[in-house]
Swiss-Prot record:
GO CC, alphabetical: cytoplasm
Residue pairs linked by disulfide bridges in the UniProt entry: none
The organism of origin for this protein: Photobacterium profundum (strain SS9)
Name this protein carries in UniProt: Chaperone protein TorD
InterPro entries, alphabetized: Chaperone_TorD, DMSO/NO3_reduct_chaperone, HscB_C_sf, TorD-like_sf, TorD/DmsD_chaperones
Keywords from the UniProt entry: Chaperone, Cytoplasm
Family that this chain belongs to: Belongs to the TorD/DmsD family. TorD subfamily.
NCBIfam families named among the record's database cross-references: PRK04976.1
Protein's gene: torD
Length: 216
């Protein structure tokens, strides 16, 4: 049971890390941390999983390239704004509604579905993050919290139900649109840092879905 809890905590941390990475522009402190030993160790651990080896290497290469990029933090902030705070035509907007909604507009059914799920599981969106509920950062934060709920549940049947809810969420609320989101990033992200980030996210979600399927 302790191994189960520890593994789930690692899963949640990865979802929360990706949520924070895609929620806002990186600060100078963030960029420094990405060059540090802790991030190197973290990525080395992820890269030991065969399914994540290539996307982790690509992400590492993107981090290393930052070292030679003039005004790296400012340029990354510009990349973030150009991709994620732009228009559907010029950017790669991080909302599920853009990719799998019926209208192609914001706050479509995926956002409504997320609001229902957050109410059902008692997981609130951070008040300071004023974005539609189907923003990638909100969805990833929700997944991390759903994982921790399973850790805290003492009843075995309820805990199993929460694990199955995670599988459904990854398949129906993440993997149904983030591969298209990754392609949109690739087409518009000249430097490639955020493309590498989202490609790593897609690979991790696919791996996590396989893990959860094996838990059935």
């Amino acid at each position: 049971m302790q191994e189960f809890i520890a593994f789930n905590e690692q899963r949640a941390e990865i979802y929360w890390w990706m949520s924070s990475l895609l929620a806002r522009e990186l600060t100078n402190e963030d960029v420094t941390e990405y060059h540090g030993d802790e991030m190197f160790t973290f990525l080395s651990g992820l890269g030991m999983t065969p399914e994540l080896k290539e996307p982790v290497e690509a992400f590492r290469n993107a981090i290393n390239t930052l070292k030679t990029r003039e005004d790296a933090q400012l340029e990354l902030a510009a990349d973030f704004c150009g991709l994620f705070l732009s228009t559907p035509k010029s950017g790669a907007l991080p909302y599920a509604s853009i990719y799998v909604g019926e209208s192609g507009l914001l706050n479509d059914k995926p956002a409504q579905d997320m609001n229902v799920l957050m109410e059902e599981y008692g997981i609130a969106q951070r008040k300071e993050f004023n974005e539609p509920a189907d923003h990638i950062a909100v969805e990833l934060d929700f997944m991390g919290n759903l994982i921790i709920q399973a850790n805290q549940e003492l009843d075995e049947e309820k805990r199993e139900a929460l694990m199955q809810a995670q599988l459904a969420f990854v398949n129906d609320m993440l993997l149904n649109w983030i591969p298209a989101f990754a392609q949109s990033c690739k087409a518009r992200d000249d430097f490639g840092f955020y493309t590498a980030s989202v490609n790593l996210l897609v690979a991790f979600c696919q791996l996590d879905a396989a893990f959860l399927l094996g838990e059935e």
